[in-house]
């Protein structure tokens, strides 16, 4: 699969895929993810997004709120949330990654997002079937 074979990405290695296969998960979906992240346009998009995020942090927007509109991506986004929190939450700095599952959270926390402290930036997360 050729992703990183140790550390926080070891779950995407062949050894990490064995338990996934035994649990009935489709390893081909992980291979599709691997192909996606190897795509140069994907990384151009990430680089552009990082520049935007740095600008938001300079503007004191410290909460990264992902509005998830794809229920099946919840576990993936929790993994992303953990990576961001562990990687950037050091030395009294970082951003707070928050995953809100829509439309459920639309009724429970949207009021806070809209009228509370304005230190959030938002990412809308959708999955388009190909």
Say what each PLM segment does.
Residues 4-123:
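Active-site phosphate/pyrophosphate-binding segments
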């Amino acid at each position: 699969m050729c992703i990183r074979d140790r550390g926080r990405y070891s779950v995407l290695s062949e050894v990490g895929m064995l338990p996934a296969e035994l649990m009935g998960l489709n390893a081909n979906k992980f291979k599709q993810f691997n192909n996606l992240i190897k795509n140069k346009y994907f990384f151009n998009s990430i680089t552009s997004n990082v520049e935007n995020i740095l600008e938001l942090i300079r503007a004191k927007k410290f909460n990264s709120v992902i509005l998830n509109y794809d229920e099946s991506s919840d576990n993936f986004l929790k993994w992303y949330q953990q990576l961001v929190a562990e990687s950037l939450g050091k030395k009294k700095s970082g951003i707070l990654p928050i995953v809100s599952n829509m439309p459920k959270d639309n009724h429970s926390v949207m009021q806070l997002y809209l009228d509370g402290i304005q230190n959030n930036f938002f990412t809308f997360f959708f999955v388009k079937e190909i």
